[in-house]
Amino acid sequence: MSMRLTFKGDKKIQKKKKKNTKSLQSSLESAENDPFWTDANELNELEGPAVIYKIDDDAGVSLGIEEVKESCVLLPLDKVSLEPELTRQVFLLSILNNTILLKSCLGKYMSCSKSGDLYCTQEAVGSQEQWIAENLGSGFWAWKSVSTKKYLTLSREKQDQAIACVSDTVIPEAKWRIRVQTRFLKKNKSSLFDNPTIHSRQLESMAGRKLSTDEKKTLKKAFKEGVLHEALLDLRVSSRSDKYG
C-alpha cells in the first residue's frame, strides 16, 4: 500500500508510458515512403516517376498517354494539388549518355517522329527516344528532341490544345514544369550526368531482347565511349542477319 499523503484538489500524477519503438519506426518509414510530389529544379533531380505539366489562369494540363493508339496527349491536372490522378500522366525518367529517356506506364519509351508527332510505341531506344532537358531556371524546363533538334511545344487553336516538337527555339509554349517524387531526390550526391552509369537491364530494355555476356560488354564499352546508339544499331543489324541469313 502506498503511504504517500494526498490532499483534496491535488492533480493525479499520470504514469509515463513507454514509447512503442516499433510503432515509431514504422511511422517514420511510412512517412519517408509516401509519394510526395515537388517541382524539380536541378538536372540531378530528374530520376524516377515524373509529371511534365503546364499551368495557367484557366487550368493545368500534363503530358499523358492515349492507351489505345499509344500516342501522347494532354490530360487535365489539378492546378491546386498538382498531383497525377492517372498512371497515364506519369513517366519514368532515366539517364542515357547525358540524355533523358521517358518511359510510359505501358512500358514503352516516348518517341518523336520526323514530323514532330509524339508517341509511346518503342521498347528499344534510338535517337528518337532520347531527350535533352534544358533547365531554364525558376522551375521551368524545355524538352528538346535529340533526333529532330526541336522543342516540345503546346499549341492552342480556339478551344483545342495539341502537343508536338515543332519549335526551333524556346518560346513560351515550350516552357514546362516537372513534378518528381521527393523520395527520389538525390541529396548531397554528384549528378548522374557527371558520372553516367548503365546496367545490363537497361541495355536489354534498349535492345528489346536478352543479351549475351559478350554483347553486354560491347555495349557497356560503347556507352563509356559515347557511341551506344551506333552500337545498338549494329546489334540490331547483326540480329536480323543471323535470323534471315
From Swiss-Prot:
The domain of life for this entry's organism is: Eukaryota
Q: Mind telling me which CDD domains this protein's record contains?
A: beta-trefoil_FSCN_fungal_FRG1-like (cd23339)
GO BP term, example: mRNA cis splicing, via spliceosome
Question: What InterPro entries does the entry give?
Answer: Actin-crosslinking, FRG1
The molecular function terms of the Gene Ontology recorded here are:
actin filament binding
Gene3D superfamilies xref list: 2.80.10.50
The ranges of region (Disordered) come to 1-32
**Chief place of localization:** nucleus
- A cellular component term (GO) from this record? nucleolus
Which subcellular locations apply to this protein?
Nucleus, Nucleolus
Q: Which residues form the signal peptide?
A: none
Give the protein family: Belongs to the FRG1 family.
Q: What does this protein do?
A: May have a role in processing of pre-rRNA or in the assembly of rRNA into ribosomal subunits. May be involved in pre-mRNA splicing.
Quaternary data? Component of the spliceosome.
User: How is this protein named in the record?
Assistant: Protein frg1
This chain is encoded by the gene named: frg1
